[in-house]
Every structure is written in structure tokens, then in C-alpha cells.
Amino acid sequence: MKRILLLFLLFCGGYVHAQELDSARIHYRQGHRNVDVLFRDNRTELERFIRILREEHGTGRLENVVIRSWASPDGANRLNEVLSKRRADSLKAYLVRHAGIPDSIVSMHGEGIAWDMLRRMVAASDMLYKKEVLHILDHTPVWVFDESGRVVDGRKKQLMELRGGR
């Protein structure tokens, strides 16, 4: 049976999931796109995942690697979309080079802002105004438009204005 390895990049980093095999997190410095093996535990996580990629590819069971990447909500939305795509590109090149897998089996999806990850982090925290932040994350659309199609409000705006921006 062929196996599919999934690779997820989350928030300022990434989550690697090898279906039925293993998982690992890859982190990025804020605003950066290049894989940095010296940042946090990236070296250990990448070495382990690359070993799995090599093994699965060597046995012919590796069918596909999917990279999904995200960025934190700070900064402009368009820049976060571009950053998440560039992180996916960078990681693909890194995996192809170090694991020796063909680039044709790697697909990428830059997802922009990691709203779900932010929600999980807030829910697990003891931060001030946690309930209000969760309410905004759960009930406010990313963008709110007026009748003319202009953006008049949104999730990020409400978060930044919550309690006077504290």
C-alpha cells in the first residue's frame, strides 16, 4: 500500500504529520521563510522526518508529500499569505535536497494566517481577556464588508482594538 506523508507548517513554524508514521513540528522565526535547523528543535525534527521520507521512498511506498504552511496574524494579511507560500517553497526545496525525493511528489498549500492554531493557543492559555478573544475568534469573520463591498471591520481589527489594544 502506498503511503501519503503530510507536512504541515503552522503559525511561526510547522507541524509535520506522516500518516500512520510520525509527526514533528518545524518552527520559523517571525517573518522568516527559510528553514533554520538551529532554531528551536528543528534539527531533530527534520532529521527524523527526512529519515522516514528516505525509508518510505526507498521501499516505493511514498506516494505524495503535502506541505501546508501558515503564518501568525501579525502584519498585513497579504504579506502573511505570501510568507506562508514562501515557507512551503523553502521547505519543499529543503526536503527534496536532503531526503532525495522527487519534487514531483511534493505539493504545497500556503494557507495564510493560522487562525485555528491561534484559537487553540489562546484556549490553552491563562491570558487576560481570554473569553473575549475566543469570542472574537469564534464569531467574527476575517473580513466584514459594507453594502459597497468595502472592508469595514474584521477579526484582526477587533482583536487589536479589544480593551483599548491591550
Q: Model-predicted segments: where are they?
A:
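Short glycine-centered, acidic/aromatic-flanked micro-motifs in structured strand/loop junctions
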Residues: 30, 69, 78
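Soluble non-cytosolic domains of exported or imported proteins
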Residues: 40-44, 74-89
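Bacterial Sec-dependent N-terminal signal peptides
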Residues: 1-23
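Periplasmic OmpA/Pal-like peptidoglycan-binding modules at the C-termini of bacterial envelope proteins
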Residues: 20-40, 44, 52-64, 97, ...
